[in-house]
Amino acid sequence: PVGSIEVALTPERLNYLVRRTEFAASWGFSAEMLSPEECANLNPLLDPTTFIGGFHTTGEGIGKALRGAQAQGERAQSNGATFIGNTTVTGIETVGSKVTGVRTATGVIPADLVVIAAGGWGSSIASTAGVTLPLVSMEHQYAVTEPVSVLAKGRDGDASVPFVRIYEAGTYVRDEGDKAGIGSFNHRALPVSDSDMVNNAANLEDPSKLPFTQVDWDQAWVETLEVMPVLSGLKYEQAYNGVFPYSADGFPLMGPAPSVDGLWILECLWATHSIGAARSLAQAICGIAPDIDFAPADLTRFDDAELVPADFAQRCDNAYIDTYAIHHPAEPSTSPRGVRMSPFYDEQENLGAAFFDTSAWERPRWFESNAGLLAGLNVPARDAWSSKFWSPIAGAEHLKTREIAGIFDMTSLRRINVTGRDAAKFLNYAAARNVARGTGAVTYTMLLDHNGGIVSDVTISQLAEDRFFIGGNSPRDVVWLKSISAGYDVQIEDVTNGTTCIAVWGPQAREILAPITDTDLTNDTFKYFNAKETSVAGVAVTAVRVSYVGELGWELACNASAGSQLWNAVMAQANRVGAVPAGRSALTSLRLEKGYRAWGSDMSREDTPTSAGLDFAVRTDGEHLGLAAASARATTRRLRTLSLTDIETVPTIGQPIFMSGKNVGYITSAEFGWSVGHPVALGWLPAEINEGEVVQISCGGTTVNAVVAPDAVFDPTGSRIRV
């Protein structure tokens, strides 16, 4: 390794690089900020007068992809693998929904398990099995100069000085012996179609090297020379447009193809991912819980609505162009938008909803119609970074929910029906506690993998002896349930797209719903963690008495066709009592005050119920998948609630936690707790750190103190939710 330097030309970039040093600390990597002079001392190509600082890490290096592939190939052969070289793959053979082989120019190779790891050709190969991969191959410019006077002569092409990224120029520069190699993202997206990829493979000696387009290079080169003027006047010994695939969100595509049994995907990888990604996928194929949860890269994160070629092609273009952009964790997509909307989207838009998108769903963060609630509200000053994509209106919605009620759009969450003769037996096995407890019973629990890791946290409502309704998190929940259902007479149906869900939460939730339903909502008749199929405002709903904000209330799920009718009826009653529509920002601050976890940001398959603080949601009352394995795992870290003492600093995801100067963990979620008057966060800490101890959080170069708190800093007994 030779290390790397990322230079900042603007104060905004410099602040972002400071945060990158913090993220590096969270993941155990050594990184530091350097002055321009210190950067130039490490890499003589840099002119220290042209930039204002740099991020430096020593662990980065140049990956030799061919050497790596050769070494892995030799190891595989020594373990019995056979390679068939110079063979054109023309498709995947299937019978029904099962893979049966690989079709080549010389015949069919029988196989009941196939992994597509074909780089830019992966999309066209997958399409022969009826699988759409949201990826597009992109041209990427690269040039190598003639020898540079300040670089060491006579080297064999290996790097000897740190790799440099010049984000504002959209370029990176490395030394290739005594020459400079420059790559550029500073150009328009140049997608290569699947058909062109196939034609290039047939007609070009190296189909991953296309002709250099000078018009796309000139601006990037000018901006690079501003930081490295020593390269001025040099000619290029090589210049070409390379080709590699980009996914719709810039992350890899891994995991089983949902529609074809035995077909697995390993695409959109860079050399840095290769061995780790291959190991994780191999573990998953063998039925072993991967050491590293690849949920952010799991193919199933893309729902069917996100697999429209024109839409994901646009997202792939954006992902390429934004490779070197400053990314904020709360930043919404720019395009395409409006792909998936709740049935009452127009009504929300009329209320001034500030929308963001998740899995292509439009979700309101807050409502401008609530701006009048800011009068008299004490809003603490907030740091610039956490103020992005945020509004104090969210605080007003939070407080109004605690005072009266909030109406929340929960449409984007996963809704699953599980039915059949073995439905109860199957779910008792799949869940970490018995869920077949009688019609009307609602159970909060987890789905665990074979290693005891948390696949998802779910609420399971028993609607009949053989019929259950699950509130889940993502399409992955459905794929997981189906993958472990062999041998059970059970049907698993994702009903998210044809349904919607509205949550009514707050002290006056009963006053809102009682006038528009004949169902008795009193506590004696409709208890907490109970469900009923009933009617609200003439709409057939599944009413589930649960709450993600720690207040009395119900989630109302119904057919999407009746969603607008239900929303309008609920909002009419909400207006009558002074309740308000509320967005996801308020939901986050409300749940954090209660210590409620969010799967995906706070916990993953790498965590157990014990480490995540969810032991209360499991029971050793039967044979539950993964529970014994979870119990056998040592608990070395725990997810803890943190109360911050600095009311003006709200951490963001991934920022490091220190104790006595040592990095001990990182933040998973944070928001200002409007009911308690200070920021509240969840973060991972060593198991031996106890409640009441003080830690420090590094937030954009500022260090703030936080106290390890009880899980719930608001209404710790849960009395408000059970009235």
Which role does the model predict for each range below?
Residues 104-160, 292, 563, 580-581:
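Central helical "cap/lid" subdomain
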